[in-house]
Design a protein with these regions (language model features):
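Active-site core of glycosidic bond-cleaving carbohydrate-active enzymes
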Residues: 2-7, 28-32, 38-60, 68, ...
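Aromatic- and acidic-residue-enriched carbohydrate-binding clefts of CAZyme catalytic domains
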Residues: 3, 9-35, 102-105
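Primarily short, surface-exposed interaction patches in extracytoplasmic proteins
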Residues: 57-65, 70-76, 83, 94-96
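Non-catalytic C-terminal accessory modules of carbohydrate-active enzymes
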Residues: 227-373
């Protein structure tokens, strides 16, 4: 499956050459920055980007009805990349793509590299969950493990991500330089420290806190890599003063994705379920009291917690689907008392210790945690 830049409601044509395009963007056709009767603008990543919401919904719910519905699309996107990628030596390379609309012919755009990884991981996990296409998983895993690494460059004495391996190196607007971090989800607090340092450097260099339609990914990306929480909140406060009450940016005629910027950023700061580890208050100023109720994270867990006087005062996790849980001990290496409840009945009480608690959970069960006396 290969999609153009945009798709409209059934009956609305969004890809063919039009009088509007000929009037205002005729030069794009003449310079071959956009296809005549196509409107892909050189990009091969659009269908993979469409998988983002499907992937998020799948990992946060683990409800079989949903992957049954979307799996054919996700598999179709994976099939495109299986055919389109070029294997050179021990790595897969992406040729003739575009990191930004119209940057035709670039090699290994960093967004596509992140999205392809996400697609292959998602389609494989969906196939396991649904019990289908087991003969395809080896190829999907091979692509995941052998696709090119993220291109790098030096800017102002720092190593940062390069937008492509060959072609566009940097862009002064939007946030495609960090979207392999979020929403593609390929870098997080459990990533290699050197990769996290490069990600920090890139956020420092980009500074896209108030971007036309990219802030919605820039803020969560900063959270995912553990950027300074006070800085994030200062910038988020300024951003929120540049929106309508519903989150739509002032003077921005498009970009409904910006509705998510503030709540999504705050949620990720308070509770993060990423890279198979649930963390509470992972990127939140410890001196700021805060609480949250049933934030949904990967694994189909609903998490509630409170931070008071610099310490986690309470933590409760409801398991919808009975998935395995790995919880980063919010009290560091202190011993923790866990109680397991189901239908108002206490099933188990035990003491836990260690940096990360690994456990099996029961569907419909609640797990409460408090530091042991």
């Amino acid at each position: 499956i290969l999609l153009p830049v945009g798709a409209g409601p059934l009956g609305i044509e969004t890809t063919r050459r039009s009088p509007f395009m000929d009037t205002y963007f005729k030069g794009w056709f003449e310079e071959k920055l956009v296809e005549d009767e196509g409107f892909f603008m050189g990009q091969k990543s659009n269908s993979a980007y469409a998988v983002v919401n499907m992937s998020m919904q799948f990992y946060r719910t683990w409800d079989k009805a949903y992957p049954r519905k979307v799996y054919p699309f996700v598999k179709g996107v994976a099939a495109f990349w299986e055919k389109y990628l070029t294997l050179e030596g021990d790595r897969y390379v992406i040729y003739n793509d575009a990191i930004h609309e119209g940057t035709v012919g670039t090699m290994n755009p960093i967004l596509s590299l992140g999205l392809v990884r996400m697609v292959m991981q998602t389609v494989s996990d969906m196939s396991i969950f649904l019990g289908v296409d087991d003969d395809k998983r080896e190829q999907w895993a091979f692509i995941t493990n052998h696709i090119s690494g993220y291109p790098l460059q030096e800017r102002n004495g720092k190593t940062v991500f390069r937008y492509t391996e060959k072609g566009t190196d940097w862009w002064d607007g939007n946030t495609l330089g960090i979207q392999h971090i979020y929403p593609a989800g390929q870098i997080g607090l459990n990533s290699d420290p050197e990769m996290l340092k490069i990600a920090h450097n890139t956020v420092d260099e980009m500074q896209r806190w108030l971007d036309f339609n990219g802030s919605n990914s820039f803020f969560p990306a900063a959270v995912r890599i553990g950027y300074d929480p006070d800085s994030i909140l200062v910038h988020l406060n300024a951003y929120s003063r540049h929106t309508y009450p519903n989150g739509f940016q002032l003077d921005n005629p498009h970009g409904i994705e910006n509705w998510s910027t503030v709540p999504n950023t705050i949620n990720e700061m308070l509770c993060m379920g990423h890279q198979d580890i649930v963390r509470v208050f992972p990127v939140w100023p410890r001196e700021k009291d805060a609480s949250f109720h049933q934030i949904r994270v990967e694994g189909a867990f609903l998490v509630s917690g409170e931070l008071k006087n610099g310490e986690v005062a309470s933590l409760a996790i409801f398991s919808e689907q009975g998935r395995p849980l790995s919880l980063l001990n919010p009290w560091k290496h202190k011993k923790v008392r866990m109680k397991v409840w189901q239908s108002d009945r206490l099933l188990e009480e035990k003491e836990l210790e260690g940096e990360i608690f690994h456990m099996e959970t029961l569907p419909g069960a609640s797990y409460s945690f408090i530091v042991s006396n």
